[in-house]
Design a protein with these regions (language model features):
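SAM/dcSAM-binding transferase cores
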Residues: 172-215
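Conserved Class I SAM-dependent methyltransferase catalytic core
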Residues: 3, 120-173, 178
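Conserved SAM/SAH cofactor-binding pocket of Class I
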Residues: 12-89, 93-96, 102-107
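Conserved SAM-binding loop and adjacent beta-strand
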Residues: 1-16
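Residue-level signal for inorganic ion chemistry
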Residues: 10, 97, 126, 180
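Mobile active-site "lid"/loop adjacent to the S-adenosyl-L-methionine
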Residues: 98-125
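A general structural signal for well-ordered alpha-helical segments in protein cores
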Residues: 7, 11, 33, 37, ...
Length: 215
C-alpha cells in the first residue's frame, strides 16, 4: 500500500486523540486505500469504522487491504459519494484527508481527478456534510495544506486543536492538522517537524512508534 509521510503522521495523531468506547463509531471520508482506517483500528480496539471512497479502484484496494488485515471485522469499506451517503448512524468521530489540489492542476484522467482533486467536494460542503453525520459530542479530524490556513479559519468554528506541520525544521509549514466539533472549546496550537538534520524528529518518532517498525 502506497503511503505518504504526512498522512501517516495525521493518522497517528488522530489515533492518539480519539477516545474510543464500546461500539463507538468513526467515519473515514475519502479513505483512499484505507490507510487512516487501518491506523485508527490498530490503536482503538473498541471502535467500528465506516470507510467511504467515491473512486471504485481505490475502494476495491481499500477493501482488499482491510480483508488482509486483522481488522476486517471492524472496518466496512463503502464505495459511494459522501454527498449522496445516507446513514442513520451519528458518528462519534469523523476523519478526513481530502484532496489537496485546485482545478489548475487537474489531471486528464477522470478517476485520478476525482480521487486527487477538489472539483467534487469543497471545504464548505465537507464541513456541512460532516456536521450532519457527527454526534453533538463528536470530533472531526482534518488534514489540510497550510496554504489554505485563512480559508480554514474562515470556514471552521470551534477548533480545539491545531498542529502546524513542517517537512523539515528549517522549512515553512506545509500541512495543518485540525480537531474541531460543535462544542465551544479553547484552541490549543502546536507545531511539529517531520525531520531535522535529515533524521526523523523525536516528536515524530513518538507519534509513529506503533506504526513504523524502525522506531
Amino acid at each position: 500500500m502506497k503511503v505518504c509521510t504526512d498522512s501517516c503522521l495525521f493518522g497517528a495523531w488522530a489515533a492518539s486523540e480519539i477516545q474510543s468506547f464500546e461500539n463507538s463509531r468513526l467515519l473515514d471520508i475519502g479513505t483512499g486505500t484505507g490507510l487512516l482506517s487501518l491506523m485508527i483500528a490498530q490503536q482503538n480496539s473498541l471502535i467500528k469504522i465506516d470507510a467511504i471512497e467515491i473512486e471504485k479502484k481505490d475502494a476495491l484496494q481499500a477493501a482488499n487491504n482491510v480483508s488482509e488485515s486483522v481488522f476486517a471485522k471492524k472496518i466496512n469499506v463503502i464505495n459511494e459519494d459522501i454527498k449522496t451517503f445516507n446513514s442513520d448512524i451519528k458518528y462519534d468521530n469523523i476523519i478526513c484527508n481530502p484532496p489537496f489540489f485546485s482545478n489548475s492542476l487537474l489531471s486528464p484522467d477522470v478517476d485520478k481527478n476525482t480521487a486527487k482533486h477538489q472539483s467534487e467536494l469543497d471545504l464548505k460542503t465537507l464541513i456541512n456534510i460532516s456536521k450532519n453525520l457527527l454526534k453533538p459530542t463528536g470530533d472531526f479530524f482534518l488534514l489540510m495544506p497550510y496554504v489554505r490556513y485563512n480559508e480554514i479559519i474562515s470556514e471552521i468554528r470551534n477548533i480545539s486543536k491545531m498542529v502546524k506541520v513542517r517537512p523539515h525544521s528549517n522549512k515553512d509549514f506545509f500541512r495543518i492538522m485540525i480537531k474541531f466539533s460543535d462544542r465551544n472549546s479553547c484552541l490549543q496550537e502546536s507545531e511539529i517537524s517531520i525531520k531535522e538534520n535529515g533524521e526523523y524528529t523525536e516528536e515524530f518518532k513518538i507519534l509513529l512508534k506503533n506504526f513504523y517498525l524502525d522506531f
